[in-house]
A protein has these predicted regions:
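N-terminal small-residue-enriched
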Residues: 1-153
Length: 153
């Protein structure tokens, strides 16, 4: 459920909405833009092993790598740095070179299971306003369907 937007002062004036204090920049040489700082998905009640066992065939993306997002369209692509092919609800073998591709809003609507665990990670978000530190956190989530790109190993 969308609760709010990240809006800096200038964006708020343009859209007639109040600023949420989301303007960030690397340093004074960059113009500020609306940027994430701490982004989280709350923990759910599903067991991680059960999510895999009931998925049928798919990809278990254990660790994600870098990627990019088009803020105008919500389109994204992210590398899977550690992934496993799942066949009949069982982890079959590791995969390499996989990437997840989609549109943020559409993929969020396809989350069908949310795990009990919750982990955090630090990263860097690069944009026109420079590179700034970020903090993200989420439990394991299962997405009913999405585009997976890559090549045969």
């Amino acid at each position: 459920i969308l609760k709010n937007y990240m809006i800096d002062k200038l964006g708020g004036l343009r859209m007639g909405m109040p600023s949420t204090g989301s303007g960030r920049r690397q340093d004074y040489t960059f113009a500020p833009t609306s940027r994430m700082r701490n982004t989280y998905i709350a923990a759910g009640s599903d067991d991680d092993a059960e999510m895999i066992a009931t998925m049928g065939d798919g990809l278990y993306a254990a660790k994600m790598g870098g990627g990019s997002v088009n803020p105008a369209t919500g389109e994204f692509n992210f590398a899977v740095s550690e992934g496993y092919l799942v066949k009949d609800g069982k982890i079959a073998h590791p995969v390499r070179g996989a990437s997840l591709i989609g549109r943020g809003g559409e993929v969020l609507m396809k989350i069908d299971r949310v795990g009990k665990d919750c982990s955090r990670a630090q990263g860097i978000c690069g944009s026109l306003s420079g590179s700034v530190p970020t903090d993200v956190g989420q439990p394991h989530i299962r997405i009913s369907s999405m585009t997976v790109g890559g090549r045969d190993a």
